[in-house]
Amino acid sequence: MSNALPSAPLDAADYIKSHIRTVPDWPEPGVQFRDITPLLQEPKSLRVLIDLFVQRYIDAKLDYIAGLDARGFIIGPILAYELNLGFIPIRKAGKLPYNRLAQSYELEYGCATVEIHEDACKPGDRVVIIDDLIATGGTMMAGKILLERLGAVVVEGAAIIDLPELGGSKLLRDSGLALYTVTGFEGH
């Protein structure tokens, strides 16, 4: 990515989208992988991204940002730091050392499980769940269920990218979860 200013003004969402690389046929044929590493590598684009989330949540009276394993662990702690909040990791099964709750969810072929520490938050705590991308919505839905089992109020789900054709954002909204995504891509 160049440090040169764009020739035409871009809004923040277009600027962010311009820093996401599409890798065709990865990890398997037919998949268009949306790679956020160029976005993370450039300090300016990372700052613009975090500032978008900070502006959205600065007055939301939150207690925590919860990040989904693994790319939610990249932006979640930065956002929590900027908002002076705690960070809750929601991990893949078998990664958390203390007493935990688990929630399974369906994948295209099979299922997966995420876990949260049983003392991650208290009833009534206000939480935003964050990840890099919403595809089928399964991971974010499982995270929402876990937080609600602990009594948290899940204020919103947030992601950099929405892939609306995969149905995840609709599934999450239909469940009552408000969503904020910075940008979206058509296709897989």
Curated annotation (Swiss-Prot):
Q: Does the keyword Transferase apply?
A: yes
The family database entries (InterPro entries) matched by this protein are listed as: Ade_phspho_trans (IPR005764), PRibTrfase_dom (IPR000836), PRTase-like (IPR029057), UPRTase/APRTase (IPR050054)
| Gene Ontology annotations of biological process type | adenine salvage; AMP salvage; purine ribonucleoside salvage
Cell compartments where the protein resides: Cytoplasm
Any one Gene Ontology MF annotation carried by this entry is: adenine phosphoribosyltransferase activity
A GO cellular-component term linked to this record: cytoplasm
Q: What is its EC number?
A: 2.4.2.7
Keywords, alphabetical:
Cytoplasm, Glycosyltransferase, Purine salvage, Transferase
Class of the enzyme per the UniProt entry, highest EC level: transferase
Pathway as given in its UniProt record: Purine metabolism; AMP biosynthesis via salvage pathway; AMP from adenine: step 1/1
Gene3D superfamilies the UniProt entry points to:
3.40.50.2020
Q: Write down the chemical reaction(s) this protein catalyses.
A: AMP + diphosphate = 5-phospho-alpha-D-ribose 1-diphosphate + adenine
Is this entry keyworded Cytoplasm?
A: yes
NCBIfam families per the record?
apt (TIGR01090), PRK02304.1-3 (NF002634), PRK02304.1-5 (NF002636)
Please report which protein family the annotation says this sequence is part of: Belongs to the purine/pyrimidine phosphoribosyltransferase family.
Q: What does this protein do?
A: Catalyzes a salvage reaction resulting in the formation of AMP, that is energically less costly than de novo synthesis.
PANTHER family of this UniProt entry? Answer: ADENINE PHOSPHORIBOSYLTRANSFERASE (PTHR32315:SF3)
Do you know which HAMAP family this protein is assigned to? Aden_phosphoribosyltr (MF_00004)
Subunit (UniProt): Homodimer.
Name of this protein = Adenine phosphoribosyltransferase
Which lineage is the organism of this entry classified under, starting from the top rank? Answer: Bacteria, Pseudomonadati, Pseudomonadota, Betaproteobacteria, Burkholderiales
